[in-house]
Amino acid sequence: MAAEFAPHEAYATCSKSLQHEWKFVARVVPGAGEQMGQLEGIIRDRLIPVLMKGRRNGGPPTQYDVWLRDVTALPVRLLGLGIPKPTETADRDYKTSAAASEAITEAIFRGEDIDADEHVKTGQKARAAHKEAVKEAVEKEWERLGS
């Protein structure tokens, strides 16, 4: 694994590129979170241990592995690595994308002209709701990990 030789570069690649790729899939494919278990396993069992200079024994995840994965999913401002769990975030990402594109989708289905202002308003509202939902989820996880 490249992360063994260049952990910083592997982290940067994950946080700047790969996350955007799997988030795109999550936004456009309903139920994508169910299909991202293998990706989550690779992040938890291979990437995170290498970044933390730990080594996995290849067995099932230990309680420590699960805890470490939970911590690394936290935003950097809360001392995590900001590597979200694709299995847990995909459904929320899809719902936000569907809500943000609702006005334009409906106009296309009805064969009507697209109201750009309505599309922008719908998108802004969906993004604001998404941001609030993510904030609440992060705060809940922060409290759970702190107790």
Which residues make up each language-model segment?
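Nucleic-acid-interacting cores, centered on viral/eukaryotic replication and modification enzymes
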Residues: 1-147
